[in-house]
Amino acid sequence: MSKKYSVPESIKLKTHLDEASFDSMYLDSINNPESFWATQASKHITWIKEPNHISSIEMEKGEIEWFNDGILNASFNCIDRHLSNPDALAIIWESDDPSKDKKISYGHLHDEVCKFANLLKNRGIKKGDRVCIYMPMIPEATYAMLACARIGAVHSVVFGGFSVESLKDRILDSNCETVITANEGIRGGKRIPLKENVDKAIKSCPNVHSVIVVKRTGEELNLISKVDVDYLIEKEKFEAHCDCEPMKSEDPLFILYTSGSTGKPKGVLHTTGGYLLGAAITPVSYTHLTLP
């Protein structure tokens, strides 16, 4: 028999739901799923077109759809709807070197994402195109994901510690035409040759027409091909405004590969509306902070 432990008072004070409210919400989600999720979608998502159809679930076929007649944009929901308070804190980035940590406001995030999105569009990337993101854990990785979402491109994040072979396999399998990377990554003081790995991987990826490189360290970018782009230089050629592409709720948002522990890694395609709502209601607490 399992034991039940009480939640410490210090934790209770930081949550946005008490135990009774959570239990009530849970029962409502089980007993009235359509109305429950309709309420959550209206409360947490800003829609271009509100959905009338909430869900379609056929478990035997493995076919599940959420809000399939709704229209929205993930980048808008993550950034633009918060711009009434542009100095509010959007990202706290902890660097490998603690002296270089950053706090990024929604206003700054918006500008960087829009410039990145315009750079992608200038490279011919459009709605539905696949973009591989092979980067260290730096703010530009988030800018890249949100820029893809802004223009309707589908991103596939590949862990920066993966080998050349693993990177190549994921680029080919997801049919990516663009790779976003950095000259190097840093983990625990160790340098990881990301750009070098990309150069090796794309020799077997004929569809890749652009490699956008962020300068993470003081080492040279090693731009050796006509497909290579210096992100820090190129992004400043573009304005900090980019309209959001209207996306159907069931349009693809990103691809994430399984671990491969039971066979070849499989690309799991996540769609926009359902994923976004799940991400929105997951945090235990949420507080708007203002940059000092």
Placement of each model-derived feature along the sequence:
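Conserved structural elements of the adenylate-forming
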Residues: 113-114, 268-286
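Structural core segment of the AMP-binding/adenylate-forming
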Residues: 146, 150-233
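Conserved AMP-binding/adenylate-forming core of the ANL superfamily
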Residues: 91-145, 163, 167-168, 223-233, ...
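Conserved AMP-binding A3 loop
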Residues: 102-107, 245, 253-277
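Conserved small/polar residues in nucleotide/adenosyl-binding loops
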Residues: 258, 287-292
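Flexible, low-complexity linker/hinge segments
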Residues: 98, 206-208, 219-251, 278
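N-lobe entry segment of adenylate-forming
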Residues: 1-104, 108-111, 115, 197, ...
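Hydrophobic alpha-helical segments in the ANL/AMP-binding
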Residues: 77-80, 121, 139-159, 166-168, ...
